[in-house]
């Protein structure tokens, strides 16, 4: 009887470990979009995005002069130019309850207007945090990125910027959103 109890306990533990490992691997690779059947995007497709956010960064200068000047010792973290296609999402709702798409557009717009993080959900389910790139202008509220994200909420668009990956966290810093003065 004791052996059978131990075997059952070992089998249950193995199942839990496989489940946790599988979920962790899926999260790391971005293997799927949560609840894809719940609501589709408001505009655009992965083959034909409805718009474009940000200006293209270059390998020679992935960061703006403002960001370089604001960084520690004038050396920002490594970044590389990227153009990625995906749906603009409100990260807080997507990561908490899986909501995205046209049915969530109004809620997502309110969340982002009130300071929740903006994300890009790609076709393979990868998630990127989207942040305005110009450091001081972002800090001082002198960019239009958040407004653009609200306008394009639930749209599939192309986002241009600089990719930064730190400890598995992926962010695209979107350049060219400073307000005209």
What are these regions (language model features)?
Residues 5, 20-22, 28:
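Low-complexity, intrinsically disordered/propeptide-like segments
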Residues 11-24:
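Bacterial N-terminal signal peptides
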Residues 1-9:
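N-terminal secretory signal peptides that target proteins for export/translocation
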Residues 26-181:
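OB-fold and OB-like single-stranded nucleic-acid-recognition modules
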